[in-house]
Amino acid sequence: MKLHSAGLAALSLAIALGLSACGGDKQAAQQPAAAGAAAPAAAGAKVTAEVSGAGASFIFPLVSKWSADYNASTGAKINYQSIGSGGGIAQIKAGTVDFGSSDKPLSSEELAQAGLAQFPSAIGGVVPVVNIEGLEAGKLRLSGALLADIFLGKVKTWNDPAIVAANPGVKLPEGKITLVHRSDGSGTTFNFSNYLSKVSPEWKSKVGEGTSVQWPDGVGGKGNEGVASYVKQIKGSIGYVELAYALQNGMPYTAMQNAAGNWVEPSAETFAAAAASADWASAKDFNLVITNAPGEQAWPITATNFMLMQKQPKDAKRNQDTLAFFKWAFENGQAQANELHYVPLPAELVKQIEAYWATDLK
């Protein structure tokens, strides 16, 4: 997939607008607030709420854009801090924010214990990114098993026979591979390690999956932002980020072999192909992971972002304001999602979410 200039401009503008709308820095964007759940405010109605959220950096570019547009439409703001899924889960459990965001779904038991509700917000993809001079995006091919061996430290150089065999005609350097991973609790890490656990028995037994894992080797960066920064700085490095960060930073991403055996590149189309098999209707509390999904064109590390809210907050109006923002986003934010290479939720799933709000977030 080649990035069109319009798409990159939209991505850059989304982040800039999200930050300026709230006066925040790179890690914290104030985003427009919300208005109702039990009785959501009408779209376009002027409100004055200011709501706080924190969590996944995966969804930060999209929430920033939604927030700026919602602010322009309603005058409301939300302050969303890009601190990682682990931090978002911790803050919503503590009640220090109005919503948390995580790319790892919580189980029904975890939600019940913490008094939380959970619903999807958008779908995107985790992509391996590399710093190899002269390499174009999508030209380097990595199977899941090979990617696991690289992050296990078994494949140590770019001219290793396993990489060369998978990439005939690609000019590869002789140097050492430097691994870059997340240093914070991360839903991006969860989806990356969950996928590797599905395709590599050795990875599953030695490292496993989680928002934080014991990495065999490498350099840790905070947030998608931190990983992207390190990969850009370190020649011969490889890391993993949400696609928007790869595009924003002009970093070459790899092609990958999916469960159907086909080589695919990351895009909204290949993310949608992976999401097509998702059975949300059978997923209690939307607890569903869609890595390594079937589908001829499915991207293998496709991920869902989830929003978390307290069922019984101290101030019920805060929930109403927060849900009004998400209702607006679902009704008016599809174009923004497409521009930033996310996949907006299908209409049937949005109906399911709104029914869930009515019963679980009164």
List each language-model region with its residue ranges.
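Terminal targeting/leader modules
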Residues: A10-S12, A16
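Bacterial N-terminal signal peptides that target proteins for export
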Residues: M1-A10
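C-terminal motif of bacterial Sec signal peptides marking the signal peptidase cleavage site
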Residues: L17-A21
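Flexible loop/hinge segments at secondary-structure junctions
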Residues: G23-K362
